[in-house]
Each structure stands twice: as C-alpha cells, then as structure tokens.
C-alpha cells in the first residue's frame, strides 16, 4: 500500500485506538498525480480526525526528490507522534 491507502487503514481501525500516526512519503514526479495524491490524502486524514474526534499525526512527507525525503524523514515521524501525544494529554 501507498500513502493514498493510509486513510482507509486508519478508518478500519479507528475504534481500536485513541490516536494514530500516519507515515509515508510522496515524491513529486513529472505529472500532476503528486498534487492529487498529496491533497486527497491530507484531506482524508483531516476528515477522519475531525469525524472520529481522535488525533491523527500527519507524518506523510511531500518532497521534490529522494534526497529531500531522506532528510525530512529523520524527524517527521517523531514530530507527528509528539503531536498525537500532546493532544491526548491535553484533551
């Protein structure tokens, strides 16, 4: 599965957990596909979070190339997990 499938996996498990961390990488190619996948995945994750009232840390990185992806992936998962924990601790 790719980043586009993350929302459906979260949706299927939404009642099992208090929060989620979505991790993935979308690297821009030569077609508009990147824009469609990036936006639709982000929108779906946000809607799941709002509708379920559960935090979903968005650790899906969008980059122009693999080099950027490697750099951004070093901290993005930790940041997304910390965001989820912060919401769970404060609400």
Residue ranges and their predicted role:
Residues 1-4, 62:
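Short beta->alpha junction loops
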Residues 5-44:
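Glycine-rich phosphate-binding loop
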Residues 8, 71, 86:
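Charged/polar, solvent-exposed surface patches and flexible loops
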Residues 15, 46, 50-54, 85-90:
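Generic secondary-structure signature for well-ordered alpha-helical cores
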Residues 22-26, 57-64:
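Glycine- and acidic-rich phosphate- and metal-coordinating loops
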Residues 35-62:
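Short, acidic/small-residue loops that bind anionic groups at enzyme active sites
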Residues 64-75:
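Phosphate-binding/catalytic loops
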Residues 75-91:
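A charged, well-structured terminal subsegment
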């Amino acid at each position: 599965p790719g980043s586009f499938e993350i929302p459906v996996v979260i949706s299927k498990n939404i009642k099992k957990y208090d929060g989620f961390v979505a991790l993935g990488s979308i690297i821009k190619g030569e077609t508009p596909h990147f824009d469609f996948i990036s936006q639709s995945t982000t929108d779906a994750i946000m809607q799941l979070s709002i509708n379920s009232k559960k935090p979903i840390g968005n650790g899906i990185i969008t980059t122009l190339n693999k080099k950027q992806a490697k750099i951004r992936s070093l901290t993005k998962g930790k940041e997304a997990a910390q965001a989820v924990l912060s919401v769970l601790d404060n609400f």
